[in-house]
Structures are given as structure tokens and as C-alpha cells.
């Protein structure tokens, strides 16, 4: 816009006023009248600066007057200029109604000056001036205010021109506010400013042409006198141009999507950050609420804490008391165990010594009997009184056992198969008396102790209550690993009168402590959520720590492998004990020690107790001879040990049993005795008894065509016996030999023997031949 700056106008105004005052006084005189009129108008609006306002009005009037214009035309131009500036100022800071009210008065005053050249104009009253001034101040105060009334707004160029043409609208010097920093702009102002700058840059040439045309029109309006009608049209055209320019300045440019997208993204980021902060605050508040509720519950359950404390304190006191009690009683328990063990050991040693002495005495007697030169003249032997007494006792006990078998109906029993473990009445009385005294002392151990501290079931109930009420602390205390050691003294007391070598002894699974521990474990298995496996191992641990060591002591010093009753009872109790280790992957040292003791004891029995003498054929004539009877008793005694060894099938490894039973006993003693005997039905019967003792599990494999290596000597003896027996007299015995071969899986030998000797069809057992 080609408008001249305000300072340039002022400078030219001052110069023109000075030149006019020096050169032409008449022109100044004619110009002062309209100027004074304009000055009075401004003076009414601003009473405190009336004189300066009138001076400025004269300067404006003189500077805009054309030199060649007539006085009347100059006056009209000056009036229109003053009125135009007044209209622009009022249009910017006042309402439309005020401007409409003042415009007719201004037009009428101007027309009167043109027609009558009268200096009289309408002066607004003080209230109107004060209200207009107040509105201007309020309009200037909010920097981001944009009026929505287009009639009251103006374009940027019009506002600038209004300010340039009407410097009197500026506040006085003492009312001006000095700005040291740029006034902050609002977002709408910045957008409008950027929009106007881009529009000015894009249409710079057209804007300059338009501004030039406007400036020329203004200059022509100043220089040429325009009639009233034309002035009105010009005023309307100026207003329409102003409105048009206003519309152009406030209209928004085409939308830039990148800027909008960026602003939306920024706004979205701010909202998301705000949402996250609110979410964090919300979570914090929720956590505070939870902690508050927990605190409330803790405070409300303060009584439960008191009860828990009393329970733990009572449990601690209970455990301390039971430990003190057991520490005090363990000395008496050990003494009683030692007394009972000593009593049983003395009895076992006495029986073993008696058997060995009787064996030596009888063997010596038979040796003397075989020597003809040692006999006396009347044919009797010179026997020591002691040996004679031993022989009489041996024969008396045999008579008693024979009578007992006849009463029981066991007529097929062989001499030597029974256990010679009978005691004399005096010895039995003394033994039972000592055993009763020990058991009586055992009852007095916990006589002064409450059942809650000496009864296994009551103790486990206490710990079961702990496990049910506070399982976490129960399992954290590893109670399941401590209970076996805690219960061990009490179980040892119950095992004090338990003899695993007696058939009538109570089984382990029938004992009260066994039942109580089993129930405790079953209740633990019901609590699946908290079960850690320690309670399931309590019974196995108790047996491993308490029962197995006691079994080991019995095996090492008291057990007699030649006793079938003791061996059967011992194997039954060992199977019950070993069943508890079936699910355990770890190897128990106590169990291995027990198995080693069993093997060692059987080896010792084979070496010390087995003796089968070989007499000359002449000494064995007749089955009723002393030599023949003694040899038969010793053979059947060895066969009984062979059978007792094989009773450990399933408890001891197969290779160990085969080495003991077959290698050390069958091949070394039994086969030699059979080879020295005369072939016949008795030999076949003994072979059948040997085959009956062999475990069937060793021959379950249907693909086997040959027997186990340790039975090779036995199979050869069977074939030799079958060859010596004639088919006509011993047909049944040969068939029995074939059945024995089939049982021990010597199928090839059985088939060859059957082909050599055509016999009757074999029973169902030999269908595999």
C-alpha cells in the first residue's frame, strides 16, 4: 500500500504550515476557520489537549490544501478531511449505532459549510465522548480480541491509513504505555499474520497497483471539489472497498494439511502424555487403596495374629519339651535294647554251640564205630560220659520231634529237616523270666510321661494341626525331614519285644506306629496344593533309620540260616520293609548293609554248618545203620539250607543267590553226596526236592533251550542216573528225571533222553519238550 509514513506527513505539515504563514497570510486566515472548527470538535472529545489538537488540525488542513484551490473549495476539502478521519476513528473503536448517529451530523455540517460557508458544527456532549473513549480503551486492552461485526472492522491498510490521517486518536504522551518487549501474540493472530504475509508476497504487484489507485483517488478527492451527492457515492464506494478489503484480510487461505496434521499430532501427543500421567496416578491410587484395605484387614485381624502367636509359642514349647523328654529317656531305651539284644544273643550262641558240639560228638562216635579194633571184647564202644550224655540228649529231642510230627500228620518229613533249637525247661524258664523283666522295665520308661509326648499318634496329630493351619511355615520348617529322627526313640521302644525271627511276631504293617504314620502321610497327600514330597517319605525314613538297623543286628548275630521258620519270618519282614524303598530312586546305605549282612551270614553258615561225611560202601549197608542215618540227616540238613537260601529270591540279586545256592552248596556238597549214593528211587526223590527249591522266575523265559550255567553238573548227574536205571524197573524214576530236566530248561537233554528210552506220554508240564 503506497501510503506515506506518519512522520513524513508531519514533517510536510509543519513545513507547509510554516511556508503558508510566511508567504500568504490571507490563505492562512481563510484556512483557520475550518481548522478551528475541526479543532473544537476534537477539543470536545479530549478537553485536556484541546490546544494541541487544534494545532494539529490546522497542520493537517494546511498540508492537504491545494495551492491553486479557491478558499471555499479548500474549506470544503478541509471539512471533508476532518470528517473522514473522525468517521474512521469512530468506526474502529465504537459501535455501529454511534457511527451511524454521528455520520449524518457530519455530512450535514459539511454540506452547510459548502453551501453557506458557516463555521458552526455539532459538538458531541461530554458523556458521549467519555463513552467513546472508554470503548476505545476496552478495545485496545485484550490483544487477542477480533470483532465478529464486519461493519466495525477494517482492513490492515485502512487502519493504518486511519491512524496516519488521524493522529489525534492516539493517546496523549502521559497516557502512552512504553513497551519494552514485543507483545505476545495469540495463535489466531500469528496465523492471520502468516496468512497476510503469504498473501502479500503472492499478490505484491496487484496490491501495489490497487494501493496506487487508492492513493490517486485520495489525492484527487483532496484537490477537486466534489458535490454532496458524489461525496455520498464516494463515501459508499470507500466503505464498500473497506468492507471488501476487510473480507480479504480475514479470509483464511487454503488449508495446509501438513500443518494441521502436525498440530493434531502434537495435540495427540500431549493428550497421550496426559492420559499416561493420569493412568499412572490412577494405578498409584489403586495401589494405595489395596494397601489401605490390607492394612485395614491386618488391623481387623489383630486378634488372629495373637492367636497365631499363641499357637507358635505353644508349638515351640511342645517341641522343646518333647526333645528334652526324649533326651532324658534315650539312655534308658538304649540300656533296655542292649539287655534284650544280649539275652537273644546268648540264646542264639548257646544253640549254635550245642549244634556244633553235637555234630562233632556224633561224627566222632561214628568214626569210632567204624574202627573194629577200638571195640571192646563184648562189642561195645568205649564212649566218654560227656559224649554219651550228649548223644542221649540228641536222641531224646529227635524222639520228641518225631512224636510231634506224628501228631500233626507230617509223616513224610525227613530226618534233618527240622530245626534243633529246643531249649531245656530250665533254660526256657530263665529266658522268659529275663525277657519279662526287660519288658516290664520298658513299660516304666514313659510311665511318668503324658501321652502327648510318648504316643506316636498324638505327636503326629500335633504336627498335623500345624500343617493344616499354617502349611507355609510347616513346610518351610522341613518338619517331614525331622519327624523320623524325633519318632525314632518311641518306635525303638515298641520294637523292643519284636523278634523278626519268630513266626508269631506281629508284622510291621500291623504296629500302631506304622498305622499312625500311614494315616499322617495320607492326610498330607490330600493337601495337593502344599505337598512338597517330604511327608511322603516319613515312613520310608523311619524304616530306614530305625527298623533296618535292628534287622541288621538280628541277621548278623541271632539269625540261624538253618532254621526255616526264622528264615521265612525274616524274609517276610524284610519284604515289608523293602516295599517302602520301591518308589525311592536313591540307594539306602542301611539297606545295602542289611543285604551284605544276609549274604555274609549265609556264607558263614555254609562253611560252618554243612558237613556230609562219605563212608565206605561196607559201612553204608542197610538204611538203618548209624552211618547211613547220619549221612541222610546231614544231606537233608544241607538241602534245607539250600531251600532257605533260595527263599531270598526277589530280595537278593539273582547272581548272588545262584552263586551261594548253586555254586557253593549244590555243586560242592549236594551233588557229591548224590554221586556217592546208590542210584535208585531215593536219589531221584532227592533230585526232585532240589529242583522244587529252584525259583520258577529263573526259567520263565520261553525261548530258553539250555539251563543256567550253575546247573550243568546237576543236569549231568540226572542223565547219568537215568542211564544207570533200567527202563523196566525204574520207568517212573526215568520219567521223573525227564520232568526235572524240562523244569530246569534242559530241553535238549530231555529230548535226547526221551528218544533213547521210549516212555509213556509226559504230563502237561513237559509239553515244551
From Swiss-Prot:
Domain of life: Eukaryota
GO cellular component, one term: nucleus
Basic and acidic residues: bias regions: 190-201
Gene Ontology MF: a single term: DNA binding
Residue segments, region Disordered: 1-122, 134-212
Principal subcellular localization: nucleus
Subcellular location per the Swiss-Prot or TrEMBL entry: Nucleus, Nucleoplasm; Nucleus, Nucleolus
Compositional bias per record (Acidic residues), positions renumbered to this chain: 202-212
Record PTM Phosphothreonine, positions in chain: 86
Keyword Ligase included in the entry's annotation: no
Keywords associated with the record: Coiled coil, mRNA processing, mRNA splicing, Nucleus, Phosphoprotein
Example GO BP: spliceosomal complex assembly
Modified residues (Phosphoserine): 16-17, 19, 85, 118, 169, 203, 206
Coiled-coil ranges (or none): 256-308
Assigned protein family: Belongs to the GCF family.
Role: Involved in pre-mRNA splicing through regulating spliceosome C complex formation. May play a role during late-stage splicing events and turnover of excised introns.
Subunit structure: Found in the Intron Large (IL) complex, a post-mRNA release spliceosomal complex containing the excised intron, U2, U5 and U6 snRNPs, and splicing factors. Interacts with TFIP11 and DHX15.
Name the UniProt record assigns to this protein: Intron Large complex component GCFC2
Lineage: Eukaryota, Metazoa, Chordata, Craniata, Vertebrata
Amino acid at each position: 500500500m503506497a501510503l506515506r509514513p506518519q512522520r513524513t506527513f508531519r514533517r510536510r505539515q509543519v513545513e507547509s504550515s510554516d511556508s503558508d504563514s510566511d508567504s500568504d497570510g490571507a490563505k492562512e486566515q481563510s484556512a483557520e476557520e475550518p481548522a478551528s472548527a475541526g479543532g473544537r470538535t476534537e477539543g470536545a472529545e479530549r478537553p485536556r489537549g484541546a490546544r494541541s489538537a487544534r494545532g494539529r488540525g490546522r497542520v493537517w488542513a494546511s498540508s492537504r490544501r491545494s495551492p491553486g484551490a479557491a478558499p471555499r473549495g479548500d474549506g470544503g476539502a478541509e471539512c471533508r478531511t476532518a470528517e473522514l478521519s473522525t468517521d474512521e476513528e469512530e468506526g474502529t473503536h465504537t459501535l455501529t449505532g454511534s457511527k451511524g448517529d454521528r455520520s449524518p451530523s457530519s455530512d450535514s455540517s459539511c454540506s452547510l459549510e459548502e453551501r453557506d460557508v458557516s463555521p458552526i458544527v455539532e459538538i458531541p456532549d461530554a458523556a458521549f465522548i467519555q463513552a467513546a473513549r472508554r470503548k476505545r480503551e476496552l478495545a485496545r486492552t485484550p490483544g487477542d480480541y477480533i470483532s465478529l461485526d464486519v461493519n466495525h472492522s477494517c482492513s490492515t491498510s485502512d487502519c493504518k491509513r486511519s491512524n496516519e490521517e488521524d493522529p489525534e486518536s492516539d493517546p496523549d504522551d502521559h497516557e502512552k504505555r512504553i513497551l519494552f518487549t514485543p507483545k505476545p501474540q495469540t495463535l489466531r493472530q500469528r496465523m492471520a499474520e502468516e496468512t497476510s504475509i503469504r498473501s502479500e508476497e503472492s499478490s505484491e504487484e496487484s496490491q501495489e497497483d490497487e494501493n496506487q489507485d487508492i492513493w490517486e483517488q485520495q489525492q484527487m478527492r483532496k484537490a477537486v471539489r466534489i458535490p454532496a451527492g458524489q461525496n455520498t457515492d464516494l463515501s459508499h464506494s470507500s466503505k464498500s472497498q473497506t468492507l471488501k478489503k476487510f473480507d480479504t484480510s480475514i479470509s483464511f487461505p487454503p488449508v495446509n494439511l501438513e500443518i494441521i496434521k502436525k498440530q493434531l499430532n502434537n495435540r495427540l501427543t500431549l493428550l497421550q502424555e496426559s492420559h499416561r500421567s493420569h493412568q499412572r496416578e490412577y494405578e498409584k491410587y489403586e495401589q494405595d487403596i489395596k494397601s489401605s484395605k490390607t492394612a485395614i484387614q491386618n488391623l481387623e485381624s489383630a486378634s488372629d495374629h495373637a492367636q497365631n502367636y499363641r499357637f507358635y509359642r505353644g508349638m515351640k514349647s511342645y517341641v522343646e519339651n518333647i526333645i528334652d523328654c526324649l533326651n532324658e529317656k534315650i539312655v534308658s531305651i538304649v540300656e533296655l535294647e542292649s539287655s534284650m539284644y544280649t539275652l537273644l544273643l546268648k540264646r542264639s550262641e548257646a544253640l549254635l554251640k550245642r549244634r556244633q558240639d553235637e555234630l562233632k560228638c556224633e561224627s566222632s562216635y561214628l568214626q569210632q564205630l567204624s574202627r573194629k579194633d577200638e571195640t571192646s571184647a563184648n562189642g561195645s564202644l568205649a564212649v566218654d560220659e560227656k559224649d554219651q550224655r550228649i548223644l542221649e540228649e540228641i536222641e531224646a529231642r529227635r524222639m520228641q520231634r518225631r512224636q510231634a510230627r506224628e501228631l500233626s500228620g507230617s509223616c513224610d518229613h525227613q530226618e534233618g529237616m527240622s530245626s534243633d533249637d529246643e531249649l531245656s525247661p530250665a533254660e526256657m524258664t530263665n529266658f522268659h523270666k529275663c525277657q519279662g523283666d526287660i519288658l516290664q522295665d520298658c513299660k516304666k520308661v514313659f510311665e511318668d510321661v503324658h501321652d502327648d509326648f510318648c504316643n506316636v499318634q498324638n505327636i503326629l496329630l500335633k504336627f498335623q494341626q500345624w500343617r493344616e493351619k499354617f502349611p507355609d511355615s510347616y513346610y518351610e520348617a522341613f518338619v517331614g525331614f525331622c519327624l523320623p529322627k524325633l519318632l525314632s526313640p518311641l518306635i525303638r521302644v515298641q520294637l523292643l519285644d519284636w523278634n523278626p525271627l519268630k513266626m508269631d511276631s506281629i508284622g510291621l504293617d500291623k504296629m500302631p506306629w506304622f498305622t499312625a504314620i500311614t494315616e499322617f502321610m495320607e492326610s498330607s497327600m490330600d493337601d495337593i496344593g502344599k505337598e512338597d514330597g517330604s511327608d511322603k517319605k516319613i515312613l520310608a525314613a523311619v524304616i530306614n533309620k530305625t527298623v533296618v538297623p535292628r534287622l541288621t543286628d538280628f541277621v548278623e548275630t541271632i539269625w540261624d540260616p538253618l532254621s526255616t521258620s526264622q528264615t521265612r519270618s525274616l524274609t517276610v519282614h524284610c519284604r515289608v520293609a523293602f516295599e517302602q524303598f520301591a518308589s525311592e530312586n536313591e540307594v539306602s546305605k542301611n539297606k545295602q548293609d542289611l543285604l551284605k549282612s544276609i549274604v555274609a551270614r549265609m556264607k558263614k553258615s555254609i562253611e560252618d554248618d554243612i558237613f556230609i561225611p562219605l563212608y565206605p560202601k561196607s559201612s553204608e549197608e542197610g538204611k538203618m545203620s548209624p552211618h547211613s542215618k547220619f549221612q541222610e540227616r546231614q544231606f537233608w540238613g544241607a538241602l534245607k539250607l539250600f531251600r532257605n537260601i533260595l527263599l531270598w529270591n526277589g530280595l537278593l540279586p539273582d547272581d548272588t543267590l545262584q552263586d551261594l545256592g548253586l555254586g557253593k552248596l549244590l555243586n560242592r556238597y549236594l551233588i557229591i553226596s548224590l554221586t556217592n549214593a546208590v542210584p535208585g528211587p531215593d536219589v531221584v526223590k532227592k533230585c526232585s526236592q532240589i529242583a522244587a527249591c529252584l525259583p520258577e522266575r529263573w526259567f520263565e523265559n520261553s525261548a530258553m533251550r539250555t539251563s543256567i550255567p550253575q546247573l550243568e553238573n546237576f543236569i549231568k548227574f540226572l542223565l547219568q542216573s537215568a542211564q544207570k536205571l533200567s527202563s523196566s524197573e525204574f520207568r517212573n524214576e526215568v520219567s521223573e528225571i525227564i520232568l526235572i530236566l524240562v523244569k530246569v530248561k534242559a530241553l535238549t537233554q530231555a529230548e535226547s533222553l526221551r528218544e533213547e528210552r521210549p516212555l509213556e506220554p509226559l504230563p502237561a508240564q513237559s509239553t515244551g519238550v
